[in-house]
Amino acid sequence: MSHPNVLLLGAPGAGKGTQSRRLVDEFGVEHVTTGDALRANKTKDITHLDVEYDTPGAYMDAGELVPDAVVNEIVKTALDDADGYVLDGYPRNESQTEYLDSITDLDVVLYLDVDEDELVGRLTGRRVCEDCGATFHVSFNQPETEGVCDACGGSLYQREDDTEETARERITVYEENTAPVVEYFREQGVLAEVDGERTPDEVWTDVAAAVDERTA
């Protein structure tokens, strides 16, 4: 049985992590994120790409943006190794979008649409497990024990970039960069827009239906 290839788009706080985990559980796909792929390949030799540093980790350690050529190759390797995937955190610009379209066949592109003020509220109240990455919220989805992850018992913390000012900056940058990506896939006829301002279960109903429809 083949598994679907899903691209998940949405601003920070849109609920991509929650929906990605459910896609993994329901459809048996692999969750591929740019960050995880880069961290797993920190020491990969990239001298053949004719870039400044010899490994992806060198860019990360220097706090510099990893070039598209490097990110593209790392993502391609991760997708090639996956029997179905949900891709999150890539592509981030038009160049990466065109590259992705050239190396894989997407069954559906899901865009979680959430208003900016709602996103800010979600981000500033978000708490993340330092061990397993599970997310909770001070206003909704609270853990059973304050400060403790329900899933693994790890400690919960607030990310440094989850302040209101930083959250709005992140959202603005994301929307500026991703608007052309969304439009690209809309024109390709593979985009499914989902109202992300509802409960996770309600959002999931539409997410699962969109994947089922495109892979039937």
From Swiss-Prot:
It is found in: Cytoplasm. Its main location: cytoplasm. One of its GO terms (biological process) is AMP salvage. It catalyses: AMP + ATP = 2 ADP. CDD domains: ADK. The keyword Repeat does not apply. Pfam families: ADK, ADK_lid. Residues 33-66 are annotated as: NMP. Zn(2+) binds at C129, C132, C149, C152. Belongs to the adenylate kinase family. Monomer. This is Adenylate kinase. It comes from Halobacterium salinarum (strain ATCC 700922 / JCM 11081 / NRC-1).
